[in-house]
Amino acid sequence: MSPAESVAHLSPERWAEANRLLLRKALAEFAHERLIAPRSLPDGRYEVRGDDGLTSYRFTATRWSLDHWQVAAESITRHRDGGELPLSAIDFFVELRKSLGLSDEILPVYLEEISSTLAGTCYKLTKPRIPVRELAGSGFQAIETGMTEGHPCFVANNGRLGFGVHDYLAYAPETANPVRLVWLAAHRSRAAFTAGVGIAYESFVQGELGAETVERFDGILRERGLDPEDYLLIPVHPWQWWNKLSVTFAAEVAQRRLVCLGEGDDEYLAQQSIRTFFNTTSPEKHYVKTALSVLNMGFMRGLSAAYMEATPAINDWLAQLVENDPVLKSTGLSIIRERAAVGYRHLEYEAATDRYSPYRKMLAALWRESPVPSLREGESLATMASLVHVDHEGASFAAALIERSGLTPVEWLRGYLRAYLTPLLHSFYAYDLVYMPHGENVILVLEDGAVRRAVYKDIAEEIAVMDPQAVLPPAVERIRVEVPEDTKLLSIFTDVFDCFFRFLAAQLADEGVLGEEDFWRTVAESVRAYQEATPELEDKFRQYDLFTPEFALSCLNRLQLRDNRQMVDLTDPSGALQLIGTLKNPIAGF
């Protein structure tokens, strides 16, 4: 591919459409987070003015529960000095930099993230437009790579700073290009492999790579006069090898503490999280999650070698908890465990940095179970993020599933809530256990469009126990966190209601599939049904009241706008929350 061909997706027409789509989201989410305060105009439109008061943006919007703004993209216009100007997302952020709290230091990096997000949208606009009715009948990975929006709340949600255009085309999930991972041999003096109960290193690696590939890799080491027994194998994102390890870890390579063995044989597809790969050659094999020193949505996407040591133990602990709890088991909940992990510790960088430094997160990997072997006849898989996916005609994937199922919208929603929400509620009330249950972290098991059960993933890095008195095994202790009492329920109110149900409810209502009041009534009924089935937790239900009239508005974009390179202080995650006023609880009246 020539340099010119690599940017063929960047045309004036697609750039204009991408800018309009991004401004629609920016106006909606910044109004939701009260960064901007659109004022009503006599003609029924809304207006937002730039910091200088001279530039204005006008648009129409529908307002839903949870102060959700659904902005009509085609209605947005930009005005200055009595004339209309072309839409430009970059100009928008410069014109409202003070309103958005963008510092001189953060602004250019944020603009780079916005530019990257726009470029990604341009590429997506070149892809064949697949109606959601067709997508609803597609396979697991066709749905995964068919997602177009990314995180529904974050405006700059496809920054991926560090990727050049050739990297984007090779590794972005939406390009759906097959990837072969690079494998390194890492000397055991600095590397460690940990695994769940009953897993041995040799048999596990043989199962993932195959005997022939392992023998080939061992042969490369022997040719260099090295003993394969002294090394552990680590899968590496190709970008990480070419751009980081081959340079930043040059001393390790030169001294044969790291040996590049080349690519493996299996082909993988990048998932929405960009650093996790699904094995398309053998779908029953494990996902591989790799370290990737790329800045995306407020964090460098590395993997801590130190954290990898406890990862399998945390997963085994949670899997046992789910297996032994009759309520969780009755919902069909399962987790796909991170069964094994490997990490490499660069001792010199460790001596020079604190434990949260990106330099300690450059070389590690984990293997996560595939959900494919657990499928029963007639079942299929879809990322939960797909529910809020909307096609070019404005139709949602959720609506397509409802139609496909033959159920009424309320019946379909009840099944989904039992599979997804009930386990979250029970984990919270029975164990003070919380997840990061956004759309990309949950896989839905479907049968003829109906949700049968949910699969939670990304366990070790995302779950937390908020009970200071909980008895945890020593290896699991790191998931205990201190959270102020008055913010504990935000794990449901923010992560579930505001960051996912808000979008799903508004979209289904906008399509005329299910009225907003009916949506939230069904959620309330689902909560009541769970509470009535677990009367032994009545005191906890009173202590943490899901039917409280209002709850704090926790703002995600404000975190990124404040510091887009380290969005949350990892030493005090709850202390980083940006709480701005309150939202009316949509289930309080039921």
What are the roles of these predicted feature ranges?
Residues L421-L425:
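Short C-lobe core helix of eukaryotic-like protein kinase catalytic domains
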Residues D432-V445:
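A short glycine-rich, hydrophobically flanked beta-strand micro-motif that places a catalytic Asp/Glu
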